Amino acid sequence: MAVEARGPRNDVRFLSDENDGQGMNLLGLSNFTKWKQEAVSKLIQNENLMKLMYYDTPDALSKPALTEEQVSNMVAPGKDQQIFQYRHVSNLATKQTSYISMELAYFKPLEEYRLFSEQYVSGLFYIYLLSDIEIMETNQGIRTDLILKEVYRSLDGLDSLIGMGKLGVETQLPLWVDNNSFGGYSIGFKVSDLK
């Protein structure tokens, strides 16, 4: 059963469970989980990012590269998880560490292609970066600044995320939570040509 809603121009259809006959939601939204998994895959390939996330000491970047098991523990559900495919991180106050979480938002049909097809959409892919204030300083600079730089290097301009199109930074804002004991950034990558 389709749920139909009207947008501000009263002519945009948003279908919740129907597809275009090729297994794809008409707005391309059925692949959110796959896109997040692919983004995590790209992030964990960045050795400097993994060191900054895993080691809570000022010399994090001069520490040894992480083992596959250490990286796996950072993304697997459990007490050592530091990379989440959703925004909420419940164990902030229990450990002095850094976290990455993500979400997708503001997806809508791309106006430029609307005359031809409603299968093209645009939206934002948000990455949230947080570090405990007690481990913020490193020998090379502020931890969250360095993490932001490595996330940017890993994802900006990337065009291989499962049909997601080319990513480009659209917005970046400071982010402070838990009574300012954790700080960092949110960075929004604009998805330029979802199909």
Residues covered by each model-derived region:
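Small/polar-rich, solvent-exposed N-terminal microdomains that initiate assembly or binding
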Residues: 1-113
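Short, solvent-exposed beta-strand/turn "edge" segments of beta-rich domains on protein surfaces
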Residues: 93, 112-120, 178-180
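Hydrophobic residues positioned within well-ordered beta-strands of beta-sheet architectures
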Residues: 100, 123-125, 185-187
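Residues in well-ordered beta-strands of folded domains
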Residues: 101-105, 128-130, 190
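Short, cysteine-centered beta-strand-loop-beta hairpins and adjacent loop/turn segments enriched
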Residues: 109-115, 132-137, 194-195
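"Short basic amphipathic alpha-helical interaction patches in structured regions
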Residues: 115-122, 139-148
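Short acidic, glycine/tyrosine-flanked loop/strand segments centered on an H-E-D-like triad
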Residues: 120-136
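Acidic-leaning, charged glycine-interspersed low-complexity segments
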Residues: 141-195
